[in-house]
Regions:
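Extracytoplasmic
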Residues: 2-38, 53-56, 216-221
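Cytoplasmic helix-loop-helix junction between adjacent transmembrane helices
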Residues: 95-133
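Paired small-residue
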Residues: 79-82, 90-98, 287-295
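Helix-breaking motifs and short loop linkers at transmembrane-helix boundaries and internal kinks
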Residues: 32, 64, 85-91, 102, ...
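C-terminal transmembrane helical hairpin of 12-TM major facilitator-type secondary transporters
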Residues: 263-307
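Conserved MFS/SLC helix-loop-helix module at the cytosolic interface between two early adjacent transmembrane helices
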Residues: 51-90
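Helix-to-loop junctions at the C-terminal end of transmembrane segments
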Residues: 53-64, 249-261, 345
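Helix-loop-helix hairpin linking two adjacent transmembrane segments in secondary transporters
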Residues: 91, 120-122, 129-176, 219, ...
Length: 381
């Protein structure tokens, strides 16, 4: 049940992080702005997380974890109230920064906490359940957020997220035990971790592949509507399919990762890259786009969990610091990808985002090949 609480928390944090993707056109319209400009809100959020993850985690390293989580949820809820009331884009952006600060610490400590509260022989499955919560954000959170935004307005979506977060906070207060900070690491852990070349290589891989993914994914909603010219209902269904695929990705991770982590990561990357490269090619074939999005969803979920697990395996002595750097790297990728996508839209056009995102993914795949050969003798775990 305790792992379930963390899974719910992952659900609500991932829902709010990515729900602007589903509401981009509506937010842009309400503020009379272009989607590509509003999309920079995703970049700003991600960069706050990337810059804040490590220093905020270090500042909170000695705080008892349950108390810290309750504080983060309070900040999360208040920021969503401000989002729902935002009277201009800059107020909305400010509210998103509050959420980003909560996000910075939450994802820095959550993976290690889930492993701590899980039964001794169920730690990998517990991490998979955490990832399932993230996937459900794509399955239910994003489509429901879009539906609420269409029926009412986008502000209502943020209000509902704040309400659900309040319920999760109450469950957390009731169910979680006292959780002293353990193996959090200190500032001195950072140079030690940076002397582990495979770990550094994984962090760089995260930045590269996630940049490619979000170059395309940040603008998938306007792409489907404007380039593919599918209806808003089909767009919502495609976002649902993307999230549903994440469940399959979590399942694949649980079954296959332990057998050969390197091959699993490479396989997941191929599933992320190919649909992006072919997105424009098959833009008007509805069933092909559905298939591409499904495979893409499997790939990105599998890849995210696999990379996070690899980081924890390579830094068992400083899990929170390693997770904070992972979260920061991931969000550098998100922010860079959203920025690259905006530049591509302005310079080349919306139709080219898949080509550029896929090309960045290919560079990441070459980098994976390089570090695999370079550190081939590194013990497989």
């Amino acid at each position: 049940m305790r792992v379930f609480v963390f899974s719910l928390s992952a659900f609500i944090f991932n829902t709010t992080e990515f729900v602007p993707v589903a509401l981009l056109s509506d937010i842009a319209k309400s503020f009379e702005m272009e989607s590509a400009t509003v999309g920079l809100m995703i970049t700003a959020y991600a960069w706050v997380v990337s810059l804040g993850s490590l220093p905020l985690m270090l500042l909170s390293a000695k705080i008892e974890r349950k108390r810290l989580l309750l504080f983060l949820f309070a900040l999360f809820i208040l920021s969503h109230i401000l989002s729902a009331l935002a009277w201009n884009f800059w107020v909305l952006l400010l509210s998103r920064m509050g959420i980003a600060f909560a996000h910075s610490i939450f994802w820095s400590i959550t993976a290690s906490l889930v492993i701590r509260v899980a039964p001794r022989n169920k730690k990998q499955q517990a991490l998979g359940l955490l990832a399932l919560g993230s996937s459900l954000a794509m399955i239910l959170g994003l489509p429901l957020g879009r539906i609420i935004g269409q029926i009412l307005d986008w502000r209502s979506t943020f209000g509902v997220i704040g309400g659900v977060a309040t319920l999760i906070m109450l469950l957390m207060w009731k169910l979680l035990p006292h959780l002293p900070s353990r193996n959090a690491g200190t500032l001195a852990s950072v140079p030690i971790l940076m002397k582990r070349p495979l770990l550094v290589g994984i962090y760089l891989l995260v930045i590269m592949v996630i940049s490619g993914h979000f170059t395309t994914y940040s603008y998938i909603e306007p792409f489907i509507i404007q380039i593919s010219q599918f209806s808003p209902d089909i767009t919502t269904l495609m976002l649902f399919v993307f999230g549903l695929a994440g469940v399959a990705g979590s399942f694949l991770f649980g079954r296959l990762y332990a057998k050969n982590s390197r091959k699993f990561i490479a396989f997941a990357m191929v599933l992320v890259i190919c649909p992006q490269l072919l997105l424009f090619v098959f833009k008007n074939l509805e069933w092909v786009i559905f298939l591409q999005i499904f495979l893409w969803g499997i790939g990105i979920t599998s890849l995210t969990i696999a990379l996070q697990m690899r980081v924890l395996q390579l830094a068992p002595d400083a899990t929170d610091v390693a997770s904070a750097i992972f979260s920061g790297s991931y969000n550098v990728g998100i922010g860079s990808g959203a920025l690259f996508g905006s530049i591509v839209i302005h310079q080349l056009g919306l139709g080219y985002i898949g080509f550029v995102g896929g090309a960045l993914g290919l560079l990441a795949l070459f980098w994976l090949r390089f570090i695999t050969i370079k550190f081939k003798k590194h013990k497989e775990r």
